[in-house]
Amino acid sequence: MSIKNVPEVQEFNNGDKIWDHTFNTFHAKVYIPKSKLPGDIINFGYSAPYFLIFTDFIFTNENALSYAKTSKLSEIASAYDTSIVFINPLNAGGWKSAPEGIFEEIIENSKIHQYHKDGYAILNNRFTHTTEGYAIRGAIFRTFLIGNGDGADYIAKYLLKKITGAGLWGPADIAPTVCLLENLSIKPLKKRRDIPIISVGNSKLINETISEKFDNCIFQESLDIPAAFKFMKQFIRWGWDGELLREIDFNEVNFIEEPCVVELKTSPDNQGDYAGSVTHKTGFISYYNKNVFDKGPVPLVLCFHGGGDSAKHIALVSSWWKVAHDHNFLLVCVEDHLNSTATEMMELLEILKTKYRIDEKRIYASGFSMGGCKTWDLYQEYPDVFAAVAPMDATFDVGCNLYGQPSVGLHGCGKINENILVPVFYTGGEETPLPELPFQAEKCRARMEYVLKVNECTANYNIKFEDQNKWENKIWGINGDSVEKIEDKSRNSVLTINYFNSKDENIYTAFGSISGQGHECRYHTCEQAWFFMSRFQRNKDKIEIHNCQL
């Protein structure tokens, strides 16, 4: 159950903020230090720690401020654009007699969302144009629990195990990512070894038990939050099965993550939050290998996240960053692109050209879900800019933009691209609940027909959606001129790619489906998209083969 009303936020003289809310089983006090990051433009929530402090009594604002400052948690939270949440149970007797289920309710009321402010997520529905409630802003896959005394005992007794609750995409294992346990009076009840433990001020016997029962643990005589966080930040718990993963330290692999904010002119067709404004700010995050520009201009991939997600999300969850790292190109992930148009992306592109040494013949675009729709916008409106595109897992009707409205057309002429060839690598999950592939929706079939026509493919795509029982290919309607199956061993799935020949006997068009995949974006698919796109470069109005033939 989400928070129904906007939290009442109190602001301190130094810019820090705080608010309270009472849920069914617990009280939460959310303290938000003034951020050192441009968090109002770029959503850093995906990579931010979610600090949950299990307190022995309901903190006053002064208690919370004092704890945050003294422990130096406020400095860490400020550096990551996150908050510190103090949790106290509502039952009589505090944590000592608190029932199970409190953590599950905390997670159910915690969200990372496109819209957020002052430590809470604003659950806007862009399709119904309504606000469905509010939630504590926090990444449920980076829950760092801190307990002292009875709070630590509660964690040790109930939370060091598999916990089923509300995950990102439905029921999932939501076990804590890392637990800091200070002044325990009981031995932790081990139900799983993979929960990292920071033991603070505990007895030799308890420390021996922790060392024996848990795979990742460190020990402190007295609380040292900066040292504890250095250990905490290594970990993330991901997926429906709650797998514990170690984060890559970009500094260790000489990789740059560079957030930037720019101001763009608002185009007339903008129907997002900035409609009618003269200008608006847009954020992006660039990812590239250190010294990558030393040898000359490099390829650029413009990347667009899914609806409700963020630039960090598409870079890190899909591992596009790793593709850029492994194959030495510049990745630019655009923040909140649903509130920017294809035309505005052209202005952004010009800004990027002045900031980085970009090979203008090798500019590519890709996106997942609503980001895939943005990529289709670029194909329809600015095809002559891109050497290739890789939209994934979504489409609107041909001729519509990502607002579901008629496109302004080729460079704003009112008519969409009909004859400018752009290499396309499109993929979708075979088990997705959303319409991504031709067998799932007429608009997907029509999109494929449109691309085959624009790219002058020789295949005869004379099929109808209602005649699926007659299709030779149950997913695409027809078979490609050639077919390739590429195994993704990490996910036990297969990417099946149908390639279609164009009139010049080259292959510019690929449609792929992934077995066992729902609505998601995977590293394997992104890397294959790069392999395909990187073959091409654009020389004015002509596509040239840059690499070897398929």
Listing of model-derived features with the role each one plays in the protein:
Residues 1-50, 98-106, 118-127, 141-158, ...:
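A domain-start/cap signature at the N-terminus of enzymes
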Residues 102-141, 344-361:
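Conserved acidic catalytic loop of the alpha/beta-hydrolase fold
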Residues 37-48, 53-95, 292-298, 303-339, ...:
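Short substrate-entry loop that stabilizes the transition state in hydrolases
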Residues 165-185, 384-396, 400, 422-423:
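A conserved short beta-strand
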Residues 223-225, 518-524:
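Catalytic histidine-centered segment of alpha/beta-hydrolase-like enzymes
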Residues 198-201, 425-428:
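Short beta-strand/loop motif that positions the catalytic acidic residue
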Residues 65-74, 184-191, 313-321, 373-376, ...:
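Alpha-helical scaffolding within the catalytic cores
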Residues 205-207, 433-446, 521-524:
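Conserved alpha/beta-hydrolase "acid-adjacent" motif
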